[in-house]
Regions:
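Structured beta-strand/loop patches that form or line metal/cofactor-binding pockets in enzymes
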Residues: 1-57, 344-349, 391
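Metal- or metallocofactor-binding catalytic centers and their adjacent structured scaffolds
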Residues: 6, 38-40, 44-125
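C-terminal extensions of enzymes
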Residues: 7, 345-394
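Conserved, mostly hydrophobic/aromatic
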Residues: 35, 42, 113, 126, ...
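Metal-dependent enolase-superfamily TIM-barrel catalytic cores that perform enediolate-based chemistry
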Residues: 131-254
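Shared catalytic-loop signature of beta/alpha-barrel
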Residues: 242-257, 264-363
């Protein structure tokens, strides 16, 4: 017997305020998976994942299929409360992930389910999901004794010069300390763009660049060299994942620290990056990495291996994943870069009632309240739902 009475799976189509463009993809809306867990006492929790075929190989259909066939009563047998749930989830992987050498198949589905379960069980006990983080592993020095304030980065996507200038001016006026700039989009003059943005953002701004697999291993050194005068702090995913092992040789030649993103989707990816020396930093995102527990495990490996960490986000995340990211960010020390909580700046409509968008300078505080700290707006969920499937465990 399990305390879970049912799960509901929702395919929601989230509209964006404007199209988001980078070297790998362009989107004006986001296909998101929402999982709703209902416990036998009526307590409800929600979670979110963003299946992306070009990231973890998942689609909405594959996540539905995975979660519908999951034997959740057996998985959660004898789980009675939040702490026992967390202990059980530590070793929980979907069958498709077990067969995947990169450990990423099913990660968006696992993330959505994990968050919904944590949200429901934490709400029932009047706790925050953040309180459960210390139970997810022996992370020691990585965790703060108490949740603290955080500061998010800004982001400038590849647009027309006029729009990029306006974005940069907004970033500077709004007091951001860090900004990410997308590079590698065909037809863009990246050296000129970056020099122009550096002039506007100022000498003190931390500017990192994200190529989204734009360049081949054979050309990356030449592509990066003219960008160095603008002093980027980090270069994210410069080559396709299939060529990422070449970074072990190329990384010392690039003149800028390298962060892995598309090549960092599961714990085996992180182990490989450490063993081969292909990265200086790892970009951990809850959805692509399988949820809070697996993400913390990767972050801990990075810390023990001397690598930096970015806690990132996927374009189109609603307030559910924003809240989950905040719960993690407020409790983990030493996060080099933090992305997320862009909600009202990116989404034309959100799924949650609260506005948890970061404030001036990207600053944000821990979320009060139980569960993830946010509440789903049922009208918004109904309006954005494209498909729905209920699984009952009577």
């Amino acid at each position: 017997m399990t305390d879970v009475r049912s799960i509901d799976l929702f395919h929601v189509l989230v509209p964006l305020r404007k199209s988001i463009k980078h070297a790998s993809f362009e989107r004006a809306s986001s296909d998101n998976l929402i999982v709703r867990v209902t416990l036998r006492d009526g307590t409800v929790g929600h979670g979110e994942g963003l299946p992306r075929p070009y990231v973890t190989g998942e689609t909405i259909d594959s996540t539905f299929a995975s979660l519908v066939k999951l034997d959740l009563p057996r998985t959660l047998e004898d789980v009675a409360g939040l702490e026992s749930l967390v202990r059980r989830l530590v070793g929980f992987v979907l069958p498709e992930a077990q067969a995947d050498p990169r450990g990423m198949a099913g990660n968006a589905a696992r993330c959505a389910l994990e968050l919904a379960l944590l949200d429901a069980f934490a709400r029932r006990e009047g706790r925050s999901v953040g309180e459960a983080i210390p139970w997810m592993g022996s992370f020691g020095e990585m965790l703060n004794a108490r949740p603290g304030p955080v500061r998010y980065s800004g982001a400038i996507t590849a647009e027309s010069p006029g729009k990029e200038i306006r974005s940069a001016l907004k970033m500077r006026i709004y007091g951001f300390a860090q900004v990410k700039v997308k590079v590698g989009v065909p037809g863009q003059d990246d050296p000129a763009r970056l020099a122009r943005l550096r002039r506007i953002l100022g000498r003190g701004m931390d500017i990192r660049i994200d190529a989204n697999e734009a360049w081949s291993a054979g050309e990356v050194v030449e592509r990066v060299r003219p960008l160095l005068p603008s002093r980027p702090s980090v270069l994210e995913q410069p080559v396709p994942h299939e060529e990422a092992e070449a970074l072990a040789t190329l990384r010392p030649m690039l003149g800028v620290p390298v962060m892995l993103d598309e090549s960092l989707c599961g714990y085996p990816d992180a182990e490989r990056a450490v063993a081969l020396g292909t990265a200086d930093l790892l970009n951990v995102r809850l959805s692509k990495c399988g949820g809070i527990g697996p993400s913390l495990k990767i972050m801990d490996l990075a810390r023990r291996s001397g690598l930096g960490v970015q806690l990132g986000c996927h374009p189109g995340e609603t307030g559910l994943l924003s809240a989950a990211g905040r719960q993690v960010a407020c409790r983990v020390r030493g996060i080099r870069f933090l992305e997320g909580s862009y909600d009202r700046h990116v989404l034309a409509r959100n799924l949650i009632r609260e506005d948890i968008t970061f404030g001036y300078g990207g600053r944000a505080r821990p979320l009060p309240g139980v569960g993830l700290g946010v509440n789903v707006d049922p009208d918004a969920l109904a309006a954005l739902t494209v498909a729905h499937r209920e699984v009952r465990y009577d």
